[in-house]
Amino acid sequence: MEKQKLSVKNSITDYIEWLAQYGASADGGVTRLLYTKEWMDAQLAVKTEMSSFGLETRFDDVGNVFGRLSGTQSPDEVIVTGSHIDTVINGGKYDGAYGVLAAMLALKQLKETYGAPKKTLEAVSLCEEEGSRFPMTYWGSGNMTGVFSEQDAKEPRDESGVSLQTAMHESGFGKGVFQSAYRTDISAFVELHIEQGKTLEMSGRDLGIVTSIAGQRRYLVTLEGECNHAGTTSMKWRKDPLAASSRIIHELLLRSDELPDELRLTCGKITAEPNVANVIPGRVQFSIDIRHQHQHVLEQFHQDMVALINGICLQKGIRAVIDEYMRIEPVPMDERLKAAAFETALENGFSCEEMVSGAGHDAQMIGRRYPACMLFVPSRGGVSHSPKEYTSARQLEIGVRALTDLLYKLAY
């Protein structure tokens, strides 16, 4: 089928504003937490809009919404595109929502311009990615890929004590045949997303082609020393866990800077007990988050970090407990899909560059099971998870155009 020149017929910015009404806050932010009324209203609105585009729509058993354009030659070979509908508390309008709406608009325009594809296309509005209501992330893509089961919904609870399973049932989901095995019909997944960083804005390029999504490890480090008087305890006799933690964090940041490929290290949470100005703390806890695109780098840094913490604490007479509570492996994006994305960008005259995603995305979960790729558009100031999150209309439209043409290349 001969490819025609496509334009964005429906304003992506209008759709961004439309979806942002569901869970809108007074300062321009959006809060759409899994299985709340705002979330349910948004998913139903998306499903209705997909149907108006002529797509076959359905909910799966956890609340993911699919809009299907069946293929004529290989209907069982499905190319899925989309992102997540949920937000962080008082987040922005674009994170996740942009990828959902772009997927819908791309399928609408392809259908109107070319009719049915050879391979099946599906737009998906994934129910959850952020982990903002329950202490579990990727509930939507994790179910689609068979990583999670209904058993996994029983324990996680929100701040009100409501379990994930209860909230799911109260929203009308989780009562049918639960997706217990991964889908075998998906041949590719494409996710369009805002960058949530400032690399593209600084380089002036239109698109980022993601090469891999960084692996993550998170730790809670507990240091126990000796609580004592701030005025009467000599510096040389102290067993101060806060002083030890300061030295540990400083040394880890220095070491992360020395690596040739950037390792991102964050210590974003720290508590001291009893947290009194004139008392040497007896106990300190702090978090460590490390991210890198190569598994061997993460593993080596982990080993070096454990040795450093134990070494400093041994010198100071402090007991250390290191609890690794999250481990997500790096996921490379599919080479064939990346090449097709680059080709599409060049054909349209869009400037682009390869990027590693330091943030986790649904493509990371899905990319473990199926070929996947991600496209980024610029984020102004690199701001995200905030009401100030913003991407210009031109940049949004470039992303939709690139996605539409890439799907044409893959499915028609």
Swiss-Prot record:
Residues that hold allantoate according to the record: 218, 278, 291
Induction context: Transcriptionally regulated by PucR. Expression is very low in excess nitrogen (glutamate plus ammonia) and is induced during limiting-nitrogen conditions (glutamate). Expression is further induced when allantoin is added during limiting-nitrogen conditions.
Pathway: Nitrogen metabolism; (S)-allantoin degradation
Cofactor remark from the record: Binds 2 Zn(2+) ions per subunit.
Keywords: Cytoplasm, Hydrolase, Metal-binding, Purine metabolism, Zinc
Catalytic activity as recorded in UniProt: allantoate + H2O + 2 H(+) = (S)-2-ureidoglycine + NH4(+) + CO2
Annotated localization: Cytoplasm
Gene Ontology molecular function: allantoate deiminase activity; zinc ion binding
Residues holding Zn(2+) 1: 84, 95, 193
Residue numbers binding Zn(2+) 2: 95, 130, 385
EC number: 3.5.3.9
Subunit structure: Homodimer.
Record function comment: Involved in the anaerobic nitrogen utilization via the assimilation of allantoin. Catalyzes specifically the hydrolysis of allantoate to yield CO2, NH3 and S-ureidoglycine, which is unstable and readily undergoes a second deamination by S-ureidoglycine aminohydrolase AllE to yield S-ureidoglycolate and NH3.
Family designation: Belongs to the peptidase M20 family.
Protein name: Allantoate amidohydrolase
UniProt organism field: Bacillus subtilis (strain 168)
Gene label: pucF
